[in-house]
Design a protein with these regions (language model features):
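Short loop/edge segments at beta-strand edges and connector loops
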Residues: 24, 111-113, 197
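Short, basic and Ser/Thr-rich N-terminal targeting/leader segments
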Residues: 41-43, 113, 221
Length: 261
């Protein structure tokens, strides 16, 4: 178990206790959370670092010399839900991260597809969800991860200044306060996971790719298309090709979405 001085407990907005372990630098918060989950760590145990050395906030593999500073947060869940009920956790985690950033920065934060986070037209972070099923087709664990690079190269300087102004609070770092805010926002939404429609509506409202040009893969070739919208029922991406055809895309690997829109 980790040294207790690196772990803080707090009551989340939904009334349940969350344990948050801080480590100043990690190759991957998600990888450590996965290791903890397999070792039996409890529900709502989160791992947080401000410096990640093997994976960027956008999910790209990096070297240690290119390590990123920011918010890298992964939380273990042990839910009593079936896979069919878990499909919306990814989009809902993006709603939580966007709301947390917006709460503290006074900036309009948008969501791409399915879980990319945008500010001022630049992709600044993402969320992800992974899990392991037990022998009864329910989850042994889920891990929900949040990542945002707090760097002027990804954030505009004005956004960085606003974050610093709001987050200065005693000895807590900017990112630590943000991590707690993200978890509070997420668990407020997560408690309604079996009836998530109003939160999915927030996802649709924050969608920023409408009318943007992206690439899609057609018979192994990259082609340009315009984003029409997202399907509000199943969150598939609706695109229009150059010849006017409309296609519904359900796989993230079938499209290439730029980091700057």
């Amino acid at each position: 178990m980790p040294n207790e001085k690196n772990v803080v407990s707090f009551r989340a907005a939904d009334g349940n206790t969350v344990k948050l372990e801080y480590i100043d630098s990690l190759p991957s918060a998600e990888a450590l959370a996965r290791e903890y989950a397999r070792s039996g760590y409890p529900d709502r145990y989160a791992v947080f670092t401000e410096r990640q050395t093997s994976l960027s906030a956008l999910g790209e593999v990096i070297s240690e010399k290119d390590s990123e500073k920011g918010l890298f947060l992964s939380c273990i869940l042990r839910p009593s839900i079936f896979p069919s009920q878990a499909g919306c956790i990814g989009p809902l985690s993006a709603v939580a991260l966007a709301a947390a950033l917006e709460e503290h920065t006074m900036k309009n934060i948008g969501i791409g597809w399915l879980s990319d986070i945008y500010c001022d037209g630049i992709r600044i972070g993402t969320t992800s969800v992974e899990g392991k099923l037990d022998d009864f087709t329910s989850y042994e664990y889920l891990i929900v991860s949040f990542a945002v690079k707090l760097d002027p190269k990804k954030f505009t300087p004005r956004l960085t200044d606003m974050v610093k102004q709001v987050f200065e609070d005693g000895n807590q770092s900017i990112s630590m306060i943000m991590a707690k805010t993200v978890l509070n926002r997420f668990f407020t939404i997560y408690k309604e996971i079996k009836a998530p429609q109003k939160h999915l509506n927030h996802y649709v409202d924050r969608f920023v790719l409408k009318d943007k040009k992206i690439k899609y893969i057609d018979e192994g070739k990259k082609k340009t298309a315009r984003v029409v919208d997202i399907n509000k029922e199943n969150l598939t991406l609706v695109i229009e090709t150059k010849d006017g055809r409309r296609i519904s895309v359900s796989s993230r690997s079938a499209v290439i979405i730029p980091n700057k829109i």
